[in-house]
Amino acid sequence: MSSLLDIGCLFLIALIIACIFSKGYLRHFIVALTIIYYLIGNGVLGTILALPLKSEPTDVKACANTKGIILLGAGINQAFGKLEPALSAYDRILKVAELYNQYPQQIIISGGTPCGEKLSEAEIYATVLYKLGIPKSKIILEKKSKNTYQNAEFIKKILADDKDTYCLVTGGIHYKRAKIIFDKFAINTISIASSKFVPNIKILPNAYNFYITQIIIHEYLGIIRIYLSSI
C-alpha cells in the first residue's frame, strides 16, 4: 500500500489515466512518456545508465601508503536552524574516518560556501570529523570550490608540485568523473568509492529511483562537458 502512495507511483497512475482519455498524436506522446517514466521509476533505466559509472566500495587498504586523504563535498542541509552535511555526504565522511583510524594521514576537505550560507562544506564536514576524534592539526580546509572541477583546481594549488599519491574519497556514482578531473590536473590519486549509490529495481516506480537517475544523468553531462572542454 505504501508503494502505491509513493509520489512516483501516483504520477504513473495519472499518466495511465491520461493515456486512456487522450486521442491521436497526443495519446502516442503520452504513451511514450509513460513508458520512459516507468522505466526510470522502477529503476531499470537508471541501473543500465549507472553501469559505466558505478564502482563498488573500495577497501581502505588501497590507501595504506598514500600521503594524504582528499574528501570531496556533497552538499549541506539546514536542520532545526543548524547546518549539517547532506545525507549523501555522511558515507564519505565516515569512510574518511575509517581510513584515518587505520592509516593516519593528513586530510584535505574540499567544499565551498553555498549561496546564502555562512559556513563552507569543508568547515561543516570538519566539525563531524573532530567529533569522531580526528585532531584539527590533521585537517586542511579548502573553502572556495563550488564544483568538482574547482575541487581539483584549488587542491592542486594546495599541493603545488607534490607528486605523491593521495587517497580520493567520493561517492560511487561521482567516482569516475572525479577521477577524470583530478587526472586532468595531474594530481596522483587512488580513488575510493564510499558507497554503492544505485537505483533499486522495483515493480512499482518510486521517487528514490527518479532522484538517483537524475544524479546519474548529471554525472554523464559533467563527463561530456569535460571532454568537450578538451577539444
Task: Name each model-derived stretch.
Residues 1-21, 217:
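Membrane-embedded alpha-helical segments of integral membrane proteins
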